[in-house]
Design a protein with these regions (language model features):
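Signature of the SF2 helicase/ATPase Hel1-core->accessory helical subdomain module
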Residues: 1-11
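Flexible loop/turn segments at secondary-structure boundaries
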Residues: 9-10, 62-63, 96-98, 115-116, ...
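ATPase catalytic-site recognition across NTP-hydrolyzing enzymes
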Residues: 16-93
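C-terminal nuclease/phosphodiesterase catalytic domains that cleave nucleic-acid phosphodiester bonds
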Residues: 49, 53-58, 97-101, 107, ...
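Gly/Thr-rich phosphate-binding beta-strand-loop-beta motif of the actin/hexokinase/Hsp70
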Residues: 79-111, 228
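Short, glycine/acidic-enriched loop or turn micro-motifs at the edges of active sites
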Residues: 93-95, 123, 157
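Nucleic-acid-processing active sites and adjacent nucleic-acid-binding tracks
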Residues: 107-153
Length: 249
């Protein structure tokens, strides 16, 4: 049983036959013993890694599991698109928006030859109409940024419906049928990451959650951002991949 000091999402804790307790995001496990102020002070004094291991029951190796954070290079200012660059918008969509379900995640890359910049990440639980709206917003935001563009959507569940709906609106997404399991797909992309080919921003509103999921993988509870990332990197590093041929308007 996983009972973090501060609930990281809405959960239902089974207490026995026909008994359960609902914990909401941010609920404290023992507020009488450890208040939010006390826990914040502990986190500040211990550091987030040790606090996560001791109080949140989510130990993350300092360097990471499958992927080390030290492999990534960082950038302060987003790269200015150049001729030949490609924007890759990669979606891993959930089957449901239930508070206990997986997230839908979108990872946006700027690919410049063998150098990759992660420029945006979106992660949310969305009903299908809101999911489609989010896909269209990301598409409209990024499709004209670089000379080449690809929209990737995993061909499963709500992703299949999205691909069909977008096609009817004249938007041609690349339907990705993944091979192998999640670990194999991400492991196949670790070599270029370790070689320093992938860059992340120094600061971004999505960076902390992205880093946490990345370093916890493959033992993290959620891996939607990982799936979207590995899918995007597979295209970015595919041998002889022509830029801008697929995933159009």
């Amino acid at each position: 049983m996983n009972l973090p000091a501060i609930a990281e999402e809405d959960t239902i804790v089974r207490l026995g036959q026909n008994r359960s307790h609902r914990r909401l995001l941010g609920d404290l496990l023992h507020p009488e013993r450890e208040s939010q102020v006390a826990l914040d002070e502990l986190k500040a004094s211990m550091g987030s890694m040790e606090f996560a291991a001791q109080y949140q029951q989510t130990p993350v190796p300092i360097g990471g599991n499958l992927i080390k954070w030290s492999w990534f290079k960082s950038y302060d200012t987003p790269p200015t698109p150049q001729s030949g660059d490609e924007i890759i918008v990669s979606w891993d969509t959930a089957l449901s928006s239930s508070q206990l379900a997986d997230y839908s995640a979108c990872v946006v890359l700027l690919a410049r030859g063998e150098t990759i910049y992660i420029v945006d990440v979106l992660r949310a639980r969305l009903e299908y109409p809101d999911l489609k709206r989010a896909v269209l917003e990301q598409h409209n935001r990024w499709r004209d940024v670089a000379s080449n563009y690809a929209l990737l959507i995993e061909k499963k569940g709500s992703g299949l419906s999205l691909i069909q709906d977008l096609y009817r609106e004249g938007i041609y997404a690349i339907a990705v049928d993944p091979n192998g399991d999640k670990i194999m797909r991400m492991a196949a992309q670790t070599a270029p990451i370790e070689a320093g080919a992938v860059h992340v921003p120094t600061h971004a509103p999505w960076l902390d959650e992205f880093k946490k999921e990345l370093l916890s993988f493959p033992f993290s509870k959620h891996d939607d951002q990982i799936d979207a990332l590995s899918q995007a990197l597979q295209r970015a590093f595919a041998p002889g991949m022509p830029r801008g041929i697929l995933g159009g308007y």
